[in-house]
Structure formats: C-alpha cells, structure tokens
Amino acid sequence: MNKKIIILGTLDTKGEEFKFIKDIIEKEGLETIVIDVGVVGEAKLRPNIDKKEVAIVGGSSIEDLIKKKDRGYAMEVMMKGSAAIVKRLSKEEGISGIISLGGSGGTSIASYAMRALEVGIPKVMVSTLASGDTRPYVGEKDITMIYSVVDISGINTLSSKILSNAAYALIGMVKGKAPELKGEKPLIGATMFGVTTKGVNIAKEYLENNGYEVLVFHATGAGGRAMEDLIRSGYIKGVLDMTTTEWCDEVVGGVLNAGPNRLEAASDMGIPQVVAPGALDMVNFGPIETVPEEFKKRNLYKHNATVTLMRTTKEENIEIGKVIGEKLNRAKKDTALFIPLKGVSAIDAEGEVFYGYEEDKALFNTLKETVNKDKVQIVEMNNNINDEEFAIAMAKKLINMMEK
C-alpha cells in the first residue's frame, strides 16, 4: 500500500506552490491527499477534500463564512474542520506525513491541524513566521518548521529551492525507517531541568536497570505539555515528575509555563506518579535585560546568556504549593509526593545562590496542608533533590506502584 501524504493549505492563494510540492512528492512514489482550507477565492489546484467539506466539519459553511466577513471566525472554523479531517484520515487511511506552507493565516490553520496527529508522524510547515516565536504553532508536537526566507508568492529561483528542500525533507522522513515509539519495555515519563539533572539521571539509570524505558522531558513549558500529551495518548505508563518548575512560571509570570493543565494527565489516566517539587525555587526569563521591571531588584541569577532565573519568595511558594497540592488531589490511585528537605535544586542547597530555608519551608508546609493524604502519600527526606538516596527512593517507589 502506498504511503499517503496530506498536503493542506489555502489553495486559492498558494495553489501554484502547493502543486510544486505535490509534484515532487508524487514523483517519489508517494500518494497525496490535498485539503483546501482557503475561504474566499477559487482553488488553483484541485483538492481531494474541498473547502466546503472542511467548513461543514468545522461547524459552519463556506457561504456563511464569506457572508460574515469575519476573518477570525473563519480561521477558527477552518482550523477545527481541518484538524478533525486530518485526525480521521490518520485513523482510517494510515497517514504517513503532512506538509503545508503559508503566512500567518495558513500557518495557524495548518499547524493546528498538524497538532491533531500523534507524535512520530512527520510534520513539515514552511512558514514566513518560522524565524520568530514558533511556540504557538509547534505546541507540544514534533512539527518541523522551515523559514521561507521570502514571502510565499509564486515559484522563483529561491522559493523553488526552499520548497524542494521541504518536500524532500518530508519524503526522507516518510521513507526512512524509525523504531516504533511503543517498545517492549514500559515507558516512564520523567521531567528534568539543568538544576535537577543529577537527580533525574540517577533515578533514570535505576529505572532502566530494572527493565523500564525512560523518556526525559525538559521542563521548559513545551516539555511539560508534551509529556502530558503522551500520557493521555496512552504511551506513558508511569511518571517520575521530579521537576515541576513550570508551575513557577505559570503562577508568577515567567516564560516557561506549561499552562493550567500541567499535572493533570497522570491523575486523569489513573497511572502511577511520583512527584517532587523540583526547581520550584526559580522563575525563568530570557536574557537579563528582558526581566520585567517589577522584578529587577529581586534575587536574579544569570544561568547563561539567554536564561535568567529569579528566586521565588515565600508568598509565591505558598501560592505554588496550593496549586500543585490541588492538582495532586485529582489522583485516582498510586500517587506519592517526595519532599527534599535540603533543597529543590542544585542552587537551592546550603551555600548556593538560591538557598532559602524559609522559602522552602513555606512551600513544603503548604504542600502538606493542601494534599489529601488519603489519596497522596507524602514522603519527607533529609536530602537535596539531587542526592542519590532521594532519587533512588523516588525510583523505587514508582517501581513498587507499577508492579503491584
């Protein structure tokens, strides 16, 4: 059976460019399914799924969208419709990849549809916006974004090279052999930051030596969301959540938040989770000159040229502790909270720049007061989070939960 590639985009404004990509893909022996998400103009390339069908699936009609003249509403309808169709095609047809190109509108619609596909299916997005902040488009999925350099307006010497590269990149991904994500060993999701790396690596090695495969997610916002998504997809069977720092950014206003649903998936799916307040001593910002004026006089630490850390206060830790405690109370089964009494990160240790006994005490007390002990086991240890004893204790607890 031929591998099928979805080509999705606004065929009224970018028909020539999509045909260029389509011809390359089909020349390499792959089948294409073209989806039109344009609204106003006539498609310049015949689609397999036209814009009328996309609009209907999205809850409206093309006629209604044109009549309303509301670009935002039209975008929302076409995003919903295209995502639903892409998801259905993946389930029914066994889609092998997806590619698109566009400006702000096309990128928003196509990337939304791409995020409906599971991790591992190749996704390539050629965009005029790919050199800026791509977080709204990539989200927690493995979307490859390629900067178009020039506006996507016809085929010329430069655009033909860029579009060819994009098409052949997708072809290579689709034709290449990759191992299946689901392996024989049970998958465990773990969260890590630079300041919790030592502890996480110790726990990871212990888990792997005991027959588990560990996927480590960098707790940068996108990492936390990616782990939550894979938990809900059913891939991950247990969670070693040693680094819950994304809640600092969510509560205080840093740049690496994972959104308000972090720490929900494991409870909702009913899988074992062992959690620690890793790196809850810090809020993340970009280069030091980008730190908001209101925080300029706080305890700041230049982690590197592009990352500035800000020490959390007692008041912030109380608020963070309440939120995390409430999230853990969603647990249906097998949940433990490990508290490292000698610090939650490498720089929250005695003599280090973020060491704060009172701040940590406020955090720990709030967690203990908020957590429902009938649902969540609390384990306090006289260690720093990176100590071997602490890390192995967390790993052992998770194994016990998963094997009982």
Curated annotation (Swiss-Prot):
Pfam families per record: UPF0261, UPF0261_C
Family to which the UniProt record says this protein belongs: Belongs to the UPF0261 family.
Protein name: UPF0261 protein CTC_01794
